[in-house]
Curated annotation (Swiss-Prot):
Compartment(s) of residence: Cell membrane; Postsynaptic cell membrane
Organism: Rattus norvegicus
Membrane topology value: Single-pass type I membrane protein
Annotated glycan sites: 56, 63, 130, 381
Protein's job: Exhibits strong synaptogenic activity, restricted to excitatory presynaptic differentiation, acting at both pre- and postsynaptic level.
SMART domains: LRR_TYP
InterPro entries: Leu-rich_rpt, Leu-rich_rpt_typical-subtyp, LRFN, LRR_dom_sf
Membrane side Cytoplasmic: residue ranges: 450-523
Subunit structure: Interacts with DLG4.
Identification of the protein by name: Leucine-rich repeat transmembrane neuronal protein 1
Amino acid sequence: MDFLLLGLCLHWLLRRPSGVVLCLLGACFQMLPAAPSGCPGQCRCEGRLLYCEALNLTEAPHNLSGLLGLSLRYNSLSELRAGQFTGLMQLTWLYLDHNHICSVQGDAFQKLRRVKELTLSSNQITELANTTFRPMPNLRSVDLSYNKLQALAPDLFHGLRKLTTLHMRANAIQFVPVRIFQDCRSLKFLDIGYNQLKSLARNSFAGLFKLTELHLEHNDLIKVNFAHFPRLISLNSLCLRRNKVAIVVSSLDWVWNLEKMDLSGNEIEYMEPHVFETVPYLQSLQLDSNRLTYIEPRILNSWKSLTSITLAGNLWDCGRNVCALASWLSNFQGRYDANLQCASPEYAQGEDVLDAVYAFHLCEDGAEPTSGHLLSAAVTNRSDLAPPESSATTLVDGGEGLHDSTLEPITVAIPGGEHAENAVQIHKVVTGTMALIFSFLIVVLVLYVSWKCFPASLRQLRQCFVTQRRKQKQKQTMHQMAAMSAQEYYVDYKPNHIEGALVIINEYGSCTCHQQPARECEV
């Protein structure tokens, strides 16, 4: 069939005048893409791709046509003038990153209709006109990161219906205009991290029905309202790390398919009880390094699909309010950080939350403590072991049919609580005994080493001990003899009135004295 059509065309052309044939051939040649001009000096050409990188160029090369790709990165371009790339109508990608560009005129990209990828990152651009990207309706990827943009023109991205990736990281953007992305219906990735955003308008992200990943980390946001992300039905990941967020609220009751949320490194003190009910498919949540003191039971009940959570670095108050969190963690089968420490009260500061619940009997109600089960469940979770068949029944378990009124006070019924306490007591006794034996063995070892290494010193020390003991015995003997002599003076002495010899007895012997009869003097 193709050969038949070709033959008919040739037959028709041969029957026409030669002038008509020449005109038709000229028109065909004009429709063919032009071949690229000669490769500029010091540049690298690969077919219809031109790489003029790190050549300290201050202007783009001239007389270029027929190129499909042009890279001018790592040069010294300072300005993009109007019509600078008009001869590159076949161009599909243009790299201008890592230059010194500070000015981009509104019609600098005229006649670049086929460009799909544009990179302007790592320059010094402070503003872009509304018409900057109008000549390039087929753009798929735009990179404006690491510039000095302070504001975005309201219609900067107007008409970019095929745009899928937009990078604006590390600028100085302070505000996102309302409906600025209204025409970006195909956008899937948006990065506005590391800017100076202080607030978000409710319709700033309107129209992004296909957006799957949104980065807003390292800004100055002080409040997060899920109503600022309306109808982002395809959003899968939301990063709000390292802002100044103090509260998290949701003023719209609607459900979205978010699976990953990062709120770490903020200043969160309060979260509305129903805030996570709008994200029932959430699997990964980062809440570490905030100022949370406790978590509402209603929030815990809404974390049914979580498989990973980080809660460390908060100001946990290990009072009665921590019981709901402790019970939820004891039943949680996913991954969570093990270093949850109490910040208050003083007697529990620095203690692990679950250990404090057990040690200080924080969640006891009547005679049945909750601590034994919480500790055993925590150990089970941390060692990735399967939970026991007869697990405890708690009021905060993420199950069905629970209301807020049933969560105060929180109690835990534990059939084997006494066995757990007995096991802990036995463990303490065994630990103490082993410590005592270990101490005794250390003392014996020290004596043995001393005896082997310093025998003369030990012999002298033993002789000193023996000499001192002998002296002590002699002193005791002298004291005993003195005591016996004193008893003889007071017990055996019998005075008599017989005139004659007096016998004096002391410890050195006896002495006899003769007493002369007294004579009375006459007066």
